[in-house]
């Protein structure tokens, strides 16, 4: 997770998310030897996969791909689809237009998956997309919204995502499982903050911390499977 910032043409300097300069010997030769002319003046989060750069800007629901000496092309787009009301409100059904605006908070590209996090109507959602099977899983990051006792929805999560009915775990997966992902760096920070607070389950926090500390350095994302009780 870096910030790409070009200082002088055609030189590109590399910084981490804290604006700390990264030495060129830490950047792959295939990148440092290329100009990436089309990215001049751009400063935004991006992923590097092989010799391709994937990036998004804050105000566009689109992930772009750019190769050395080529212009960016749209490769993935976050679309919410059309809204359908809950089952118990079908008699009041009214179609709504597709949402023209969502905010991508984070995106990561791997060989087999696209990981995304976006904000829509003040709620954050995570997307796990399988590039091979084209299957996707979408869940809110605030798990309190998945409590059917919550007033947010009488039957589950308000589905502004793909035009289907509201859903609770039984409508996300036939087996009552929900898939999500976590940024390892952010999760470490949250665990560290939790250690200093009084936790309801300190033993679980301890196990999570030990698991994170045992991860290889090149692991950036954790995929989690949540099982409905």
Predicted regions span which residues?
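Generic structural motif
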Residues: 83, 121, 185, 228-229
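Short beta-strand elements that form the blades of beta-propeller/WD-repeat-like
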Residues: 1-6, 11-13, 44-65, 101-126, ...
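A short, polar/proline- and glycine-enriched secondary-structure boundary/capping micro-motif
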Residues: 34-36, 65-67, 85-86, 126-127, ...
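C-terminal functional modules
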Residues: 190-228
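Surface-exposed loop and turn segments in beta-propeller and other repeat-based domains
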Residues: 19-41, 73-98, 137-163
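Short loop/turn segments that connect beta-strands within beta-propeller blades
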Residues: 15-20, 66-70, 130-133, 229
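Charge-rich, low-complexity N-terminal segments
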Residues: 59, 70-72
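C-terminal/domain-terminus segments
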Residues: 123-151, 189-206
């Amino acid at each position: 997770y870096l910030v790409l910032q070009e200082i002088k043409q055609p030189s590109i300097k590399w910084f981490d998310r804290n604006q700390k300069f990264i030495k060129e010997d830490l950047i792959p030769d295939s990148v440092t030897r290329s100009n990436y002319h089309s990215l001049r003046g751009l400063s935004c989060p991006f992923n590097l996969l092989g010799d391709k750069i994937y990036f998004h800007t804050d105000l566009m629901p689109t992930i772009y791909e750019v190769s050395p000496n080529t212009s960016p092309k749209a490769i993935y787009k976050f679309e919410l689809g059309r809204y359908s009301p809950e089952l118990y409100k079908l008699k009041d059904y009214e179609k709504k237009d597709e949402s023209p605006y969502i905010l991508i908070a984070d995106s990561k590209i791997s060989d087999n998956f696209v990981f995304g996090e976006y904000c829509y109507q003040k709620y954050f959602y995570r997307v796990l997309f399988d590039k091979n099977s084209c299957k996707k899983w979408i869940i809110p990051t605030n798990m309190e919204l998945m409590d059917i006792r919550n007033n947010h929805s009488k039957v589950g999560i308000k589905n502004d995502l793909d035009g289907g009915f509201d859903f609770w775990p039984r409508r996300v997966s036939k087996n009552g499982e929900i898939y999500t992902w976590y940024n390892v760096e952010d999760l470490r920070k949250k665990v560290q903050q939790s250690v200093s607070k009084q936790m309801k389950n300190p033993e679980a926090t301890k196990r999570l911390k030990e698991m994170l500390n045992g991860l290889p350095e090149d692991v950036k994302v954790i995929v989690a499977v949540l099982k409905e009780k």
